[in-house]
């Protein structure tokens, strides 16, 4: 379903950002919930979501 694809894209992008800059972004997952603490690059997050909707890689 599209919702799952978008959800996965969001999680993947947030994890990528946290791995790239762990001092600025921390994530904690708990089942279907995620706690996000720190700076998020919204442009990169939006691109990941749009890419998923458009059928990108």
Question: What feature does the model see in each segment?
Answer:
Residues 1-57:
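Protein-protein interaction and targeting regions used for scaffolding, dimerization, and localization
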